[in-house]
Structure formats: C-alpha cells, structure tokens
Regions:
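Conserved PLP phosphate-binding loop immediately N-terminal to the Schiff-base lysine helix
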Residues: 13-34, 47
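A short glycine-threonine-serine/GTX helix/turn-capping micro-motif
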Residues: 76-87
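Single conserved hydrophobic/aromatic residue that forms the stacking wall/gate
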Residues: 1-8, 12
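Amphipathic alpha-helix from the class-I
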Residues: 63, 89-107, 119-121, 125, ...
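PLP-dependent enzyme catalytic core of the Aspartate aminotransferase-like
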Residues: 101, 111, 179, 185-207
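Buried hydrophobic positions in well-ordered alpha/beta secondary-structure cores of metabolic enzymes
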Residues: 16, 42, 56-57, 87, ...
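Active-site PLP attachment segment
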Residues: 33, 37-67, 86-93
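Conserved PLP-binding catalytic core of the aspartate aminotransferase-like
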Residues: 110-117, 126-166, 187-190
Length: 207
C-alpha cells in the first residue's frame, strides 16, 4: 500500500483533515480510524472550533520532531512561533469544542453516519440522480441527464443551485456545486432530522 511504501522509503505522509476532522467521520481525526493511514503531519481547521471561531493548525508526529531534533543541519528547526499563531480565544474555543465532542457527539456522528448514507441512497430512484456518495456525515448527490448512461447534465444549467433554491424554501441549506448537491449536516443530528433532510431533498429535486 501507499502507507507501507512511504514508510519503507522514509517518505513523510501529510493528511488534510480540514473537512474530515473533528467529528465529520465520527472521530477527532479520520486518518487512522477510517482511512487506515498514520500520517506524520495533519492539517486541520473548521471543525476544530465547529466554525464558531476561525482557527486552523497542524499536528506533527513524534517521529518527525525527533528527526528534526537529531539533525545536524544548521537550518533544522521547527518554526511554530508565528505572529498570529496561538490566539488565546481561538485555542480556548477549540479546547471547549473538543470537550463537548467527547461528551457523546462523536459517538452520535459515528452511529448515524451509516444511517445518513443509507437514507440518501433512496434518492437514486429519481430520474436525474446519477450518484449518491459519501462517508460519515458528509455526502454528495450528483445529478445526470441520463441515469442509464450517466451522462452529465449541461454544466451551464447549474442544477445544483436550482435544487438548493427549492430546498431553502423548504428549510434545508445545501452546498450547490454545478450539478451536485453537497451536504454536511450537524453532528448532533438525529434519525428524525435525517428523514426530514431526505424528504426535503426529494421534494427539491422533483420540483
């Protein structure tokens, strides 16, 4: 695998968890638990504060730090003390956010992620829905012109925006992207919420 090849070649692995981290997949980080990757560097943002305060960061493995410390190169250093880093309010928000996540929110996301994915796949019976894909509490519904041949809709139709407008009127916000509808529901979602989301999506797509 890529992971084993990287380890054998002493190549460092960097994992981007800006979207997948902090609960979206039911774990603080999805790299090891979901994707079976043990990275040397993880970049993260967004979910670390649940969006209540702008904050991003990096996590670095002990292996990488050890290699930096043992280097004889004159310029070997880990420069992490920057002018706008370690904002006290941002860090306080992140710490409290993680405390809340570890109080049942991660478990809820882990339990309901598969339910969310399964319910969304019921939309595949609609003529223009060509694909429903995702993992955990993040998903994408892709619309096509011909389900059988999976021909994409004309990009200038921006069908995702059309569906989003209908869904907004019914109480659901999507992220439209050309012919796709992207969803990242709250981590505190319940089964009734999932049913309502799928019902509104169905109505929005039909309209």
């Amino acid at each position: 695998t890529l992971s084993r090849s990287s380890a054998a070649s002493d190549v460092y692995k960097r994992q981007d968890e800006v979207v997948t981290g902090f609960g979206r997949m039911g774990h603080i980080f999805a790299s090891e638990k979901v994707f079976n990757i043990i990275p040397d560097i993880i970049t993260f943002a967004k979910g670390v504060t649940s969006g209540y305060f702008p904050l991003g960061g990096i996590a670095i493995s002990n292996k990488l730090i050890k290699n930096l410390r043992s280097s004889n190169h004159a310029d070997a250093m880990f420069g992490h003390g920057l002018t706008y880093s370690s904002h006290p309010i941002g860090c306080a928000v992140a710490i409290k956010n993680i405390e809340l996540m570890e109080n049942g929110i991660l478990e809820n996301a882990l339990e309901l992620g598969p339910v969310f994915q399964e319910k969304l796949k019921t939309l595949l019976d609609l003529p223009i829905v060509g694909d429903v894909r995702g993992q955990g509490l993040m998903a994408c519904i892709e619309c096509v012109a011909d389900y059988n041949e999976e021909n994409p809709l004309a990009l200038d139709l921006k069908v995702g925006e059309i569906i989003d407008k209908h869904c907004q009127k019914l109480g659901l916000l999507l992220r439209p992207a050309i012919n796709m509808c992207i969803l990242s529901p709250p981590l505190i979602i319940n089964k009734n919420d999932i049913d309502k989301i799928v019902s509104i999506l169905r109505q929005g797509i039909i309209q």
